Amino acid sequence: MNLYAVRAIYKFEMARTGRTLMQSIISPVISTSLYFVVFGAAIGGRIQQIDGISYGAFIVPGLIMLSLLTQSIANASFGIYFPRFTGTIYELLSAPISYLEIVVSYVGAAATKSIILGLIILATAGLFVPLQVAHPAWMLLFLLLTAVTFSLLGFIIGIWADGFEKLQLVPLLIVTPLTFLGGSFYSIDMLPPFWQKVTLFNPVVYLISGFRWSFYGIADVSVAVSLAMTVVFMAVSLAIVAWIFKTGYRLKT
């Protein structure tokens, strides 16, 4: 593996975070803090505990996941789309660097930025509600797997998009609604039986459930199932990325 090339692209993408600090870090943290103020303090005080956990603390994993998913997609999609937009993708594809190294560089940088953001939001949440992390190693594992998986999805979107407006299409119309309906603000056990079954078709349910289990030891679905589904999502994303490079789909257009 050409580690010099990987490191160069990785450092370039990480440096972009410093140039867009307001958009990449500060804005998501402020937005999430507003959720804590509105749902955790104002509304949470009027809601009973869920599985013995205060409502403000209960929504912390879901809010971290909400930011993690959207920012992973945004970071990776813009990272690979911008070279296509400016035409520098040709230099990248003709350079002595493999497709694997390109993916590792862009996806690795996007995942790193998202994980840093997730940890900052976790620290910020501690200012609003008392927190406990029952399984910190599992928490970091779910954080890593989810960030990588959705960075891969963002990479795919960046290749598919033919305009800046399409970069926001999937996050706004698909990912964000699925996250809100995936148990970010409630346990799916609170839903009627029919909707509980329907909700299980939402892939984000498994991510949030497994991540919440790492905090409080409670989950809407089996932890093993959550982990397995996360790995499946990652494998599917990797397969699509491999197909893109094999066929050259929209790499030069």
Feature annotation, model-predicted:
Residues M1-P136, L141-T253:
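Hydrophobic transmembrane alpha-helices and immediately adjacent juxtamembrane helices
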